[in-house]
Amino acid sequence: MEMLKDFDISPFKKMKPPVDSGYTTRTEINELKKIPLNKSFVKKFDNIESAFAKTAKDNNIKDYDKSIAAKLIKESAPVILKLKKYHDRPRPKDLNKNLPNYEMASMKTPSYPSGHSVQGFLIGAYLSDKYPRSRKALMATAKNISYSRRVARAHYKSDSKMGEKLGNSMYKHIKNKK
C-alpha cells in the first residue's frame, strides 16, 4: 500500500520556517520556557501508535485496527524526512543551550516540520473518518501528540503548526485517492 507515493511536497518546501536568529524564533523559544516540562505527559504521547490504541480502547472502538497507524507512520516517514532535511531547522536545544528539555530518541532529525504533529494529525483525521463517533477523542489525541513535542521542548510552535498542516494535507491526499 503506497498511499503517499505521489504526494506533492513542493508547496511545503515553499513554507519556510522562521529564521534561526529572528524575532519569531526567539519568541518561540521564550514560549517554550513557559511550558512546564511534564515528562509523564510527553511519555504518554511519544509513541503515536500506543496513544491512538489507548484512545480507541477508552472509546470502545471494537474493530480498531492498530496496523492502520503503523502503516500511516511508515508511509509518511519518508515524506517528513525529506522536508526535515530540506528545511534543516535546528532543534530549540541547539539554538538555546540553556533550554531544559526531555531528550528522546526521536529528536535526532532536524526540527521542521514536527513529524509527531504530521503523523498525529494524519492518523487522527484518518481514524476520525473511519470512526466518526469518536472523532472528538481521536483529534484530541492528535492535538496532544503535537503539543507534547513542545512540552518536551523538542519543537517550536511553528514546527508543530506546519506538521499539523502537512498531516491534514496528507490525509486529504489519501482520501481523494479512495
Show the residue positions of the predicted features.
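Hydrophobic alpha-helical bundle signature of multipass membrane enzymes
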Residues: 1-152
